[in-house]
Every structure is written in C-alpha cells, then in structure tokens.
C-alpha cells in the first residue's frame, strides 16, 4: 500500500536490522524526508510507546507528530496489534496531535517524563479516533 503512494519502506525492528533501520531513518530525516513509525514496536504490547521513537527524535531534533487513523470498512487481522487492512474506497479519518519536541541533552528522569507525556497524548488521540462517528454530518 505504501509503495503505491510513493512512500519508501525502511525495514527493521528491535530484533532484526534495528541499528541499520535506525541509521536509515536518521539519514532520511537529515535529507528532509518525513518518516512514520509504529511507536509500540514490533512485539508490543499494543499501544504502549517504546523508547525508539524518543531516541530518534532526540538524535535528529525532529519532532514527534502523533497521527492516528480509522477507516469505516476494513478487515481486522487476528494479530497481537489487531492490524487493520482498509477496504478500497472506504471512508477514513486522520487525527494529528501537536508536535512533541525532545531535546538532545536531557536527564533520564526528564526522558521518563517525556515518554509518559507522549503515552498520555497517544492514549487521548487513540480514544478520539476510536470514537469518531462516520455517520455524523460534518459542517
């Protein structure tokens, strides 16, 4: 799906090619590209923010911009993260959060606080997108 809309894919996880993927993401950001990652990691647990997204923002200075989406018609996979495959031409909605900046030099305590604030923002936006009503008329 991403290749159809001309988006590059960087493969990697905390178990496989993690360092290589991290370096490729840094280079992409340095080249002015935007990247999207799933912050709960490849192993879960579902919807729990991992350190990778914070380390990437800290290393590059790029902000974390929360993005959540929902489609009306989809197939729900029986996977640990309940992965969704949208049906073609289904209605959808995207909800963006405010950019979150992470300074390059911060204490471990501050990083913990940042991670908690990111998790809280993600939880809030997850509920917002899950409660979106496709039948409600938009003015």
Which residues make up each language-model segment?
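Catalytic core of membrane glycerolipid acyltransferases/transacylases, capturing the structured
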Residues: 1-24, 60, 76
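Catalytic-site beta-strand/loop segments enriched in glycine and acidic/polar residues
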Residues: 26-56, 60
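Generic beta-sheet signal
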Residues: 12, 38, 66-69
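Membrane-interfacial terminal anchoring regions of lipid-handling membrane enzymes
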Residues: 30, 113-139
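Short acidic active-site motifs
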Residues: 20-25, 52, 110
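A cross-family acyltransferase "interaction/gating" segment
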Residues: 48-108
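Positions that flank functional sites
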Residues: 17, 44, 71-72
């Amino acid at each position: 799906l991403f290749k159809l809309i001309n988006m590059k894919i960087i493969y990697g996880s905390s178990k496989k090619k993690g360092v290589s993927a991290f370096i490729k993401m840094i280079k992409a950001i340095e080249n002015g590209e935007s990247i999207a990652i799933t912050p709960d990691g490849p192993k879960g647990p579902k919807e729990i923010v991992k350190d990778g997204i914070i380390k990437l923002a800290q290393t590059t200075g790029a902000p974390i911009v929360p993005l959540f989406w929902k489609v009306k018609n989809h197939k729900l996979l029986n996977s640990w993260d309940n992965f969704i495959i949208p049906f073609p031409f289904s209605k959808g909605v995207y909800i963006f959060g405010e950019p979150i900046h992470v300074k390059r030099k911060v204490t471990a305590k501050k990083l913990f606080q940042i991670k908690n604030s990111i998790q809280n923002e993600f939880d809030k936006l997850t509920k917002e997108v899950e409660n979106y009503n496709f039948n409600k008329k938009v003015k």
